[in-house]
Curated annotation (Swiss-Prot):
GO terms for biological process: sporulation resulting in formation of a cellular spore. PANTHER family: DNA REPAIR PROTEIN RAD50 (PTHR18867:SF12), RAD50 (PTHR18867). Residues 131-143, 801-820 have a biased composition (Polar residues). It comes from Dictyostelium discoideum. Keywords: Signal, Sporulation. The gene is D7. The lineage of its organism: Eukaryota, Amoebozoa, Evosea, Eumycetozoa, Dictyostelia. Residues 787-798 have a biased composition (Basic and acidic residues). This is cAMP-inducible prespore protein D7. Residues 1-24 form the signal peptide.
Length: 850
């Protein structure tokens, strides 16, 4: 019986343990499933937020690269244009956010509420708290968008709720640091806080004495909450106790860029990649550090400042859009100098101290140098001064950083070169040889260019010399005896020589004068225009009288020579008389004697004198001709002609010698047949002597007629040549008259231009005087109004003094007097400002006149 009871008790106990264990395991399993389900839902929401920001950031970066490349191709890279492109995507993001808001007539307040902090169900608080770092800088509000129970936020974080707006306009998205601003029923708050959260709602899951803890301790030896959250059984995700290794919260924290303390941030996380700093997603969006938001924003023209405007929260949508495109896209309305590159990233504390020192120094220096100006400056002027100092300081810092980067890069290059020299001496030597060879080639190219330049200069100098020689007066032929000694055998040669002497000069002169008239080669200045003096390159037409005289003398001499030769030939062939034979024999004897006595003299006179002189004269003429036929070809013609003359003379000389030898043989009786034939011929000639005399008379008459015809023909040719020369001189005179007319026209045009310039200058001066008069009249009018206002105030002051004397002043009267005094001070300030503007205008006018 006992054994049965004991056995039953053991069985019941075992069954109880089994049931208890199964129940505990089932409860733990159910709790784990519920927790995992809710946790996964919230993690998905967080991941969605991260992905959205990551996509936007990547899209902005890619578009910035494309825009930057496009502007580099166009050569007009401007930071404000890049900023405009980036802000366009921010506007697109705002439109997407607006689509998720309640459709309540799309009021602007909905956008403001969406980006406000400290409100339930708003995007700013939800995204910030969903990161699991509720006390860290969060993406909770847009700078300046604050209202009742809303936090304006700032780059360094606010300490609570307030209605004031931040003064730091350099940050688009502000952050907030507060431990008392947890809200209920928001994303993240539901999952991470103890009150009304997931842990508290599901039967105290994650609590200190919750079933999860008990079940975890019983089954796993560790609380489920601690395993999931890494915290001390609080059920939160990413709170201060996120330190346990390999916990879910710690992993999520690293993925998002770090916990609130930044201790779990590591390279490769989403937050670190986007912001390049150990900050959370909330801090990335808030603009702290080298973030996307701060890079897009610039001083004084951020999206937040534009969205908030300068008035209260309740600005109209039209006002918001107008100010947005007027200020954000400021490149269309303002100069580039009004913007600075915000790619400097986060400003270190020592740089902030330097900026503060420079701001203080600038204010102190201005106050010491111009106290009146400093006192009259408004808050806006002081703000512009501060912005300028900040811009200059940041630019100097950026230049210093770039110089440091360049120095570091140079040092790295040197180290790489040394390493290359140590590892690969041959390759290093080859590179050095290539560099030296490149330098040598460059030096050789430079030397070649220098030599080429010198050759070009020498070539231009030779061209100038040839041009000067061409422009000189042609040499006149004055040595008539030299031309008379030339042996020219035909009138064609004489005509060729005449054309050779004179025609090139006429053609060259005509061509040169035509080119000079086309080039309009006139040099004159104002003084010469007024004095009627001009410089030109018109030359006198060369005088051809001497050349014509020489030609006439040479022609006459050669005609006489030709006539004598023709007469001897005709007489010998017609008369056939012994007397002529004897005369011819005697002439041949004398000629042979002369040849025997002075052969060298004859050769020098015929060959050297005639030939060389003709060739030299031809070459001299061709050098002055400049283009009318090749000098070498013409000289060759002269040489050929003179060679023919020489050959003819040698042939005549040989014939004369043979004829003299033949006559000598006849005279000596060596050739009887020839002697008898000569006797018969003499007899025959005697019989026909009368006929020969008659024929001689006829021949003489014919010769006289021939001479008269040749003289008349030559006279006609000479007269024709003279007429042509006269016509050319007349044409040249007409061209010179035309050139003079052109000069006069140019002078008249210059006078008209000068008169027009003088009238234009007078008009400009008159307009300037009228503008000055209008400005002075406006200033005087304003001065009169100020004087009248002062007089009115003085009168009122006197009346107030009289009232004071009559009765005791009341508090209201004292306030009125204070208002009058302030009004007078304002009027005085306006008067000082007008005087300052007047002085500035006068200074600018004097500078313009100078």
């Amino acid at each position: 019986m006992y054994s049965k009871k004991y056995t039953s008790f053991v069985i019941v106990l075992i069954l109880s343990c089994i049931i208890s264990t199964c129940t505990s395991n089932q409860i733990s399993e159910d709790v784990g499933k519920a927790i995992n389900q809710k946790l996964n839902e919230n993690i998905e929401k967080v991941e969605d937020v991260v992905v959205q920001f990551e996509n936007v950031a990547n899209q902005v970066i890619e578009e910035l690269k494309v825009e930057h490349q496009r502007q580099e191709l166009l050569g007009e890279v401007k930071h404000d244009s890049l900023r405009d492109s980036a802000t366009n995507y921010i506007w697109g993001l705002l439109d997407k956010i607006q689509s998720y808001l309640p459709k309540d007539n799309n009021k602007v307040s909905k956008v403001e509420e969406a980006f406000s902090s400290g409100q339930n169900n708003n995007i700013g608080s939800s995204i910030g708290d969903s990161t699991g770092a509720s006390t860290s800088p969060q993406f909770q509000s847009i700078n300046g968008l604050s209202g009742a129970s809303q936090s304006s936020g700032s780059s360094t974080g606010g300490t609570g709720d307030s209605d004031s707006k931040t003064t730091n306009e350099a940050i688009i998205f502000s952050s907030k640091v507060s431990t008392t601003d947890r809200q209920e029923s928001i994303i993240g708050q539901v999952a991470i806080t103890a009150k009304d959260s997931l842990g508290a709602t599901i039967t105290g899951l994650g609590g200190v004495s919750s079933t999860a803890k008990v079940g975890g301790q019983i089954t796993n030896g560790r609380a489920q909450g601690q395993v999931i959250t890494g915290g001390d059984n609080t059920g939160t995700v990413g709170r201060g106790a996120v330190t346990t290794a390999s916990s879910v919260a710690n992993t999520v924290g690293e993925f998002l860029g770090g916990s609130r303390t930044g201790g779990s941030s590591s390279a490769g996380t989403v937050g670190n990649v986007i912001s390049d700093s150990y900050t959370s997603i909330g801090k990335i969006a808030s603009g702290n550090g080298n973030s996307l938001s701060e890079t897009i924003g610039t001083t004084g023209d951020t999206l937040a400042h534009t969205f908030a405007g300068t008035d209260s929260v309740g600005v109209t949508g039209f006002h918001i859009i107008t100010k947005t495109f007027n200020l954000i896209a400021g490149g269309k309305f303002n100069s580039d100098q009004q913007y600075i590159d915000k790619s400097y990233g986060s400003i270190p504390s020592q740089d902030n101290e330097e900026i503060k020192k420079r701001l203080q120094s600038a204010h102190q220096q201005l106050q010491e140098q111009s106290p009146a100006i400093y006192q009259s400056m408004k808050s806006e002027d002081l703000k512009n001064l501060d912005d300028e100092v900040i811009r200059n300081t940041l630019k100097e810092m950026q230049i210093q950083r770039e110089n440091q980067d360049i120095g570091q890069q140079n040092q790295e290059d040197k180290e790489q070169l040394i390493d290359l020299q140590n590892r690969e001496p041959g390759l290093y030597k080859n590179q050095q040889d290539l560099k030296q060879e490149k330098r040598a080639n460059q030096q050789e190219l430079i030397n070649y260019e220098l030599n080429l330049q010198e050759d070009q200069e020498q070539y231009e100098l030779l061209l100038d010399q040839l041009y000067d020689e061409q422009q000189q007066q042609p040499q006149k032929v004055s040595n008539k005896q030299q031309l008379q000694e030339q042996q020219i055998n035909s009138p064609e040669d004489i005509q060729y020589q005449l054309n050779h002497l004179n025609q090139p000069f006429q053609d060259d002169y005509h061509n040169d004068q035509t080119e000079e008239l086309k080039d309009d080669d006139y040099n004159f200045n104002d003084q010469q225009i007024n004095n009627g003096q001009f410089e030109n390159n018109v030359e006198e037409f060369p005088d051809l009288n001497d050349a014509n005289d020489n030609f006439e003398q040479v022609n006459n001499n050669n005609n006489n020579i030709n006539n004598n030769n023709n007469n001897n030939f005709k007489v010998d062939k017609s008369k056939k008389s012994a007397q002529q034979v004897e005369i011819a024999l005697e002439n041949e004897r004398l000629y042979l004697q002369e040849v025997e006595d002075a052969p060298e003299r004859l050769y020098e006179e015929i060959h050297n004198s005639n030939l060389n002189k003709a060739v030299q004269e031809a070459e001299e003429i061709e050098r002055q001709q400049n283009g009318n036929g090749s000098p070498a070809v013409n000289s060759h013609k002269i040489v050929t002609q003179m060679g023919n003359v020489e050959n003819n003379e040698i042939t005549n000389e040989q014939d004369a010698i043979e004829q003299a030898q033949h006559l000598q043989r006849i005279e000596n009786g060596e050739d009887i047949d020839e002697y008898e034939a000569a006797q018969h011929e003499v007899a025959f000639l005697d019989e026909n002597e009368q006929d020969a005399a008659k024929l001689q008379n006829e021949m003489d008459q014919l010769e006289l007629l021939l001479e008269e015809n040749e003289e008349e023909q030559f006279s006609n040719k000479n007269l024709q040549q003279l007429n042509e020369n006269e016509n050319q001189q007349q044409q040249q005179g007409q061209q010179q008259v035309q050139a003079t007319n052109v000069e006069q026209q140019i002078v008249e045009q210059l006078k008209v231009i000068k008169e027009f310039q003088r009238q234009d200058q007078q008009k400009k001066q008159k307009i300037q005087q009228e503008n000055d008069a209008v400005y002075l009249s406006d200033v005087e009018k304003a001065q009169l109004e100020l004087d009248a206002e002062l007089a009115k105030n003085n009168k009122q002051e006197n009346q107030d003094e009289n009232l004071v004397q009559e009765k005791q002043q009341s508090p209201d009267q004292i306030k009125n007097q204070l208002k009058n005094i302030q009004h007078e001070q304002q009027i005085q300030e306006q008067q000082d400002k007008l005087n300052q503007e007047k002085n500035q205008q006068l200074l600018e006018q004097e500078q313009n006149q100078k």
